[in-house]
Amino acid sequence: MSDSNHSLDLHSYTQLEVERFRESLIQFYDKTKRILPWRKKECIPPSEDSPLEDWEQPVQRLYEVLVSEIMLQQTRVETVKRYYTKWMETLPTLKSCAEAEYNTQVMPLWSGMGFYTRCKRLHQACQHLAKLHPSEIPRTGDEWAKGIPGVGPYTAGAVLSIAWKQPTGIVDGNVIRVLSRALAIHSDCSKGKANALIWKLANELVDPVRPGDFNQALMELGAITCTPQSPRCSVCPISEICKAYQEQNVIRDGNTIKYDIEDVPCNICITDIPSKEDLQNWVVARYPVHPAKTKQREERALVVIFQKTDPSTKEKFFLIRKRPSAGLLAGLWDFPTIEFGQESWPKDMDAEFQKSIAQWISNDSRSLIKKYQSRGRYLHIFSHIRKTSHVFYAIASPDIVTNEDFFWISQSDLEHVGMCELGLKNYRAALEIKKRKVTSLSNFKEPKLTSARRIVTKAEC
């Protein structure tokens, strides 16, 4: 149902307000923008019949923004800064990325950042763009979203506006929050009519002179000022034309919010109107409406970190295997794992460990596992799954023989192979490595195992 106590006109600005919105946001950005490695001046593309050398800088700028924008989706800025710098040092151009082998040259650069389908989409987009003559690269968001694999409307708008100064709007979580509050859209703005309205507003509001700076300012405002739970309205550059803020002031003055219904009544806002007490304490943060969260499912697994040491060089090696090509962490490297799914833990994890060895170690080599120890259970949280791993650490003889599809990799190469963060977390747990206190996975002292056989931790999570 919709809340029809106001018209659709509530969710729009006059031309004067639009200009004020743009000016205030650009001024805010000029004063507060963060210095980031991917923030450079836009590079307007030349005419279609220009020689190739005139396209070099525009294409390079487009590539830099494409990499940064895909990395920034669902990853903190401080984390992206490290990954972006390493990526650009290794794959500095669109051509170098397109020609790089995905599993050995591209994926390892992403390892540890999570949401690995983003990496695949970025590589696919670069491969597609590299095949085009620069003049054939689309210049509108719709053409990008339809024609460039792995790129959606948000990424298209961000790349075109920031890199090529195209007046294209963008919509992400930060933008939804800012615009739903600025124009008092009380709905779930991530889908349906409300999302379409947000996109319409984003395209209408974008500054035609500085579209890239405007879009970055809009995202910056949502990230540091118009935050989800405690918006800093007193320092917000658009508070004077923010309708949620105006509502808050009316309520706090002891008055009632009333809108004149003119023309078409609103069919977007929902009827979930909070009590007066709630409004007094939470009026701005009530926008946008958040859908009910889907409960994360619980999954369990047994993971074994097998280690062997070269007797001559003393170099340590670890047993890994590639995860299936579909499903969670598809195609990434991980340690030997037995998935229990949502089933309860087996009563005897030591017995499970010994039973699982048959899947990984050849029959003649099982006696060559010299020591093993349970290291306990460790939780890793994905967006939709709470994954608990019961980790074992096993020391094997150098002569051990594994079954097919398993590989021994040196400790130094673990950092570069494209290991999933879940695997690295279990590895650190097994070897008692404190993530924040080491600069390399090889920087640790090997822990001592206290027994040659049965040591089982009865830890519950």
Swiss-Prot record:
Catalytic activity: Hydrolyzes free adenine bases from 7,8-dihydro-8-oxoguanine:adenine mismatched double-stranded DNA, leaving an apurinic site
Pfam families: EndIII_4Fe-2S (PF10576), HHH (PF00633), HhH-GPD (PF00730), NUDIX_4 (PF14815)
Enzyme Commission number: 3.2.2.31
Phosphoprotein as UniProt keyword: no
GO cellular component, one term: nucleus
Cofactor info, note text: Binds 1 [4Fe-4S] cluster. The cluster does not appear to play a role in catalysis, but is probably involved in the proper positioning of the enzyme along the DNA strand.
Residues under site feature: Transition state stabilizer: 172
InterPro entries found in the cross-reference section: DNA_glycosylase (IPR011257), Endonuclease-III-like_CS2 (IPR004036), Endonuclease3_FeS-loop_motif (IPR003651), Endouclease-III_FeS-bd_BS (IPR004035), HhH-GPD_domain (IPR003265), HhH_base_excis_C (IPR023170), HhH_motif (IPR000445), MIG/MutY (IPR044298)
GO BP field: base-excision repair; base-excision repair, AP site formation; depurination; DNA damage response; mismatch repair
Segments forming domain Nudix hydrolase: 296-437
Top-level taxon in the UniProt lineage: Eukaryota
Keyword Transport: no
Cofactor: [4Fe-4S] cluster
Active site (catalytic residues): 69 (proton donor/acceptor)
Location of the motif Nudix box: 340-366
GO molecular function: 4 iron, 4 sulfur cluster binding; 8-oxo-7,8-dihydroguanine DNA N-glycosylase activity; adenine/guanine mispair binding; metal ion binding; oxidized purine DNA binding; purine-specific mismatch base pair DNA N-glycosylase activity
Subunit-level organization: Monomer.
Family: Belongs to the Nth/MutY family.
Functional summary from the UniProt entry: Adenine glycosylase active on G-A mispairs. Has glycosylase and nicking activities and is active at A/G and A/GO sites.
Stated name of the protein: Adenine DNA glycosylase
Lineage, opening ranks: Eukaryota, Fungi, Dikarya, Ascomycota, Taphrinomycotina
Gene: myh1
